[in-house]
């Protein structure tokens, strides 16, 4: 399969005098393609949530069955991010991403014609598995086309694609309901989003680009020697093209302490994020006595506050922090700790909403910065594998801690037990942010030493 998806190095070489102009144009196309592609993945993922009232009403599914379907997708997606992102290292990013979108669309068409619970469950699992084909190609593309000094801003732009994608699902499905009618709820909920996803898949194929070498250009490392990162591994002399996806994953990710540090950062970020977002509605309704309308407003602010903060964080990490991602992440987590206490203890409706919005504004920043850091601690050909480890750890462990364990703590100890759990997660996150930052500084020193040695050799040869 990967042989089919791999395009290989282009036989056509871009003339030297056109390299810079072509490179600039292609990398913008590459970024737009993964932005639109990842946006589309959310159209055929979040549409399931919008269909749940009809699953209960029309198919007579219980709340437990609907919850089980949601859990199946979450677990399948977490596993898939680990596996699919590693496989993406050996495939053409744009073809891999487009293929995943088409497969998700096919599954959604199947959902549009299904009525049995177990068929739904199987299709939801397949959808979760194919959803994992979106994130790896996105990070691989950014790592292939954009230098370290720009990845904060570029990564921030890409990161809001999931906010945009999640935001346009409701209008798409709503328009489909208005045209088709509620009697065709399965077509409106599943088949129409599937058709939209196929259109986006075609856009990815037409607009997207493979790696620079696949497009007849020099690699990023050849054009910008400062991008070379020295990694101490046993197999650095072995050509990546001759290594399997497992060998790359084992050599450059599993054995890398920095890859584990950043994965554990994500575990605790997801723990806090899912602990807030999963329990915010019931907490505000039952404990803070919000109305449903007031709760909806607080929930909206929690989600949409992330867009401006993520864009600002990308600029700050590039410009103010000079490409060092974790200091800003640690600052955000410390502020979240304070806001979480305010959210818990405040009795004012306004202040609870403000604290919830501030947590939402800040929590996506360390998640996004961890994504950018991932691209900078492993070679470009292992980015997908590192993203896969992060994805697996964050969803299987982080999301579970924030949802299931939080619920257990609330049942056993009350709400204060759940909040103590989240505060402990914040402290652990700051610790691993620090360890990841220290590891990144070590890699930076190695890179500078390598460049210094290279300059010394060139000077000696010239003399």
Stretch-by-stretch model annotation:
Residues 158-212:
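Helix-loop-helix hairpin linking two adjacent transmembrane segments in secondary transporters
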Residues 323-370:
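C-terminal transmembrane helical hairpin of 12-TM major facilitator-type secondary transporters
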Residues 48-52, 252-311, 367, 371, ...:
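Extracytoplasmic gate region of multi-pass secondary transporters
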Residues 90-101, 319-333:
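Cytoplasmic membrane-interface "Motif A"-like loop-to-helix N-cap segments
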Residues 79-118:
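Conserved MFS/SLC helix-loop-helix module at the cytosolic interface between two early adjacent transmembrane helices
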Residues 153-171, 393-402:
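Glycine-rich segments within core transmembrane alpha-helices of 12-TM secondary carriers
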Residues 123-161:
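Cytoplasmic helix-loop-helix junction between adjacent transmembrane helices
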Residues 80-92, 310-322, 410:
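Helix-to-loop junctions at the C-terminal end of transmembrane segments
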């Amino acid at each position: 399969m990967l042989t089919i998806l791999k395009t290989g190095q282009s036989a056509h070489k871009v003339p030297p005098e056109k390299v810079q102009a072509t490179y600039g144009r292609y990398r913008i196309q590459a970024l737009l393609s993964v932005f639109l592609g990842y946006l589309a993945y959310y159209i055929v993922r979040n549409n399931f949530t919008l269909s749940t009232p009809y699953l209960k009403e029309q198919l007579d599914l219980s709340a437990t069955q609907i919850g089980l379907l949601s859990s199946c997708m979450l677990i399948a997606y977490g596993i898939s991010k680990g596996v699919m992102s590693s496989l993406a290292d050996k495939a053409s990013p744009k073809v891999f991403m487009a293929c995943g979108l088409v497969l998700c669309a096919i599954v959604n068409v199947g959902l549009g014609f299904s009525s049995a619970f177990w068929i739904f469950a199987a299709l939801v699992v397949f959808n979760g598995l194919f959803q994992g084909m979106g994130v790896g190609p996105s990070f691989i593309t950014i790592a292939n086309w954009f230098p370290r000094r720009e990845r904060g801003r570029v990564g921030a732009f890409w990161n809001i694609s999931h906010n945009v994608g999640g935001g346009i699902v409701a209008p798409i499905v709503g328009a489909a309901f208005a045209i088709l009618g509620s009697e065709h709820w399965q077509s409106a909920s599943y088949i129409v989003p599937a058709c939209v996803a196929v259109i986006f898949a075609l856009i990815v194929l037409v607009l997207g680009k493979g790696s620079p070498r696949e497009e007849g250009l020099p690699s990023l490392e050849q054009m910008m020697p400062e991008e070379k990162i020295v990694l101490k591994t046993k197999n650095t002399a072995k050509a990546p093209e001759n290594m399997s996806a497992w060998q790359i994953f084992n050599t450059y990710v599993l054995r890398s302490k920095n890859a584990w540090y950043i994965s554990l950062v994500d575990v605790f970020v997801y723990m806090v994020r899912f602990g807030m977002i999963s329990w915010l509605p019931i907490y505000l309704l039952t404990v803070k006595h919000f109305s449903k309308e007031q709760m909806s407003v607080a929930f909206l602010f929690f989600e949409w506050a992330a867009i401006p903060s993520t864009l600002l964080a990308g600029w700050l990490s590039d410009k103010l922090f000079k490409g060092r991602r974790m200091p800003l992440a640690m600052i955000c987590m410390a502020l979240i700790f304070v806001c979480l206490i305010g959210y818990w203890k405040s009795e004012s409706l306004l202040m609870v909403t403000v604290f919830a919005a501030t947590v939402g504004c800040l929590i996506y920043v360390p998640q996004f910065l961890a994504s950018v850091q991932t691209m900078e601690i492993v070679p470009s050909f292992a980015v997908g594998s590192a993203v896969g480890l992060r994805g697996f750890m964050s969803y299987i462990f982080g999301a579970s801690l924030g949802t299931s364990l939080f619920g257990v703590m609330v049942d056993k100890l009350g709400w204060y037990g759940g909040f103590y759990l989240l505060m402990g997660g914040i402290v652990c996150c700051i610790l691993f942010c620090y360890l990841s930052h220290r590891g990144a500084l070590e890699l930076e020193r190695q890179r500078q030493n390598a460049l210094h040695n290279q300059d010394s050799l060139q000077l000696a040869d010239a003399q």
